[in-house]
Amino acid sequence: MGYSHEEAEHAAKPDPRSVLPFRGGETAALARVKHYLWDKDCLRVYFETRNGMIGADYSSKFSAWLAHGCLSPRYIHAEVKRYEKEREANKSTYWLIFELIWRDFFRFFCLKHGNNVFFLGGTSGRDWQVLLVP
């Protein structure tokens, strides 16, 4: 099981097509939070840019670190609250926290319901039907 040495070596090389070359681990995750919130002040305009896909700073790009446990939603929340005290509270700070809450909701929802979230009957187990609305 696992990767061969060649596969692992290839996977470790940065992909030139990547907007943001991810580096794993807590140190890289904390550096990203610092960069995004404090160095570049991207949080100030997060609401306007959050759905952009191409640029390195359009969205927070915290997902990979959150998913792997290198970064906690609690830490991000605390940093956003500190940002609100030291810089400003605005629609962007609200939305970053709001989306962290949604992330946790769906994470725990999927833990509770497992693969049922992917079945046609969904979590309720009801048969799927086409509703024709004129």
Where in this protein do the model-derived segments appear?
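Glycine/tryptophan-enriched, flexible segments
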Residues: 1-128, 132
